[in-house]
Amino acid sequence: MRERIAAGQKCYEEKRSAEKNSEGEHRIKEVDAFKGFLIFAVVFGHFLLPLKDSPYSFFGRSFYLIYSFHMPAFLFLSGYFRQKSKRKKGAKLRSLLSYLLLYLFMKVFLHLSDILFYGEQDLFPDFWHESSTPWFMLVLFFLELTLTPLDFLQEKNTKLFKQDSKRDDFLFLYLFFLMILFIPLSFSPIGHKVKDFLALDRFLSFGPFFYLGMISGESHFSFQKIPKLPCFLGGIFAISLFLFLPHVYPYTRVFYGTWGYRIEREAILPFFKAYAVLLRIGFIPFSLCIACFFYHLIVLFLKRGSGKLSSSLSSFLVKMGKYTMPIYVFHRPFRDAFFASGAGGFVLLGRGNMAQALLFYFCLLFLSALLLFLLARDSLNLFCRFRFWGK
């Protein structure tokens, strides 16, 4: 019996080792590092959220810079790797169930946080409306649903999908159709009534980034050969946004992925009030160019960084890029507890001096990195991916 158990354990370990080696072969170090940077930006951005209106403007400027690209970049990558992955039988159902269950779990988990730290009185969370952190899971769920026709045709192995050229053309036309459908729908008058019902505003606003990622995954796009022009433009956009935020602040509403009517009622130019859909369209290349700029910086850092500190930081980012899901799911209550303790009150009210505010800013950077380190665990990763259901 002991020999059988030992043999079974050895077989399991060999299988896990083979899975990790296979996974490592298909990973791109630069992309993992960029994902690590993005999830750090998510956590740091949530720490900055309560302080975005602080008299110390660098809190707000940093917050809006992060929000200008971090979720569009994540959705682009989600679409890209969804298209690149080899989908096994039953993968779609597992994905849908995982996203849905993670959404329900996050709603309950964060509702408990709201009760503990914000004095929430309702005993049960509102599962039908979402504008906070869990929206990402719900959006991924709906995006996966929109791909059902593609998956159905592929599983049936129709004539359309037997020829690569026809399959690629159909894929592009279908995804492009969804993109041009979502943008005007996000300005539909129905938004006044449904508001954040099932995060439909985020679904329509951020969906095009996911579909663009899928199109890129099917094209000749390569992370190793990103043109320099979008990186250069992204640098200009990022620096301009940070420096001139007070002048463009009314236009930042588009960063949140809200319904179009909320963009139209901001103090924007009359032309954009009449044609606010142009802001939604323009936000797509704007945010992706900024993402390209930071990706280029990460790549330069990985290639030219030297010394132990640089090596440690590179390894940290690459590792964090492999644990984005558990970090995203579990990080927010730590932020809630931190501010519920009264930390940061002097920054929000402007009671400290500039040196104290800067020190607190770097403290938030450190806490964000520490939180990533604490949540980057295999056990949490397996829980979020529901691996116990099988591959």
Regions found by a protein language model. Give the residues of each.
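Alpha-helical transmembrane segments and their immediate juxtamembrane cytosolic regions
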Residues: R2-K391
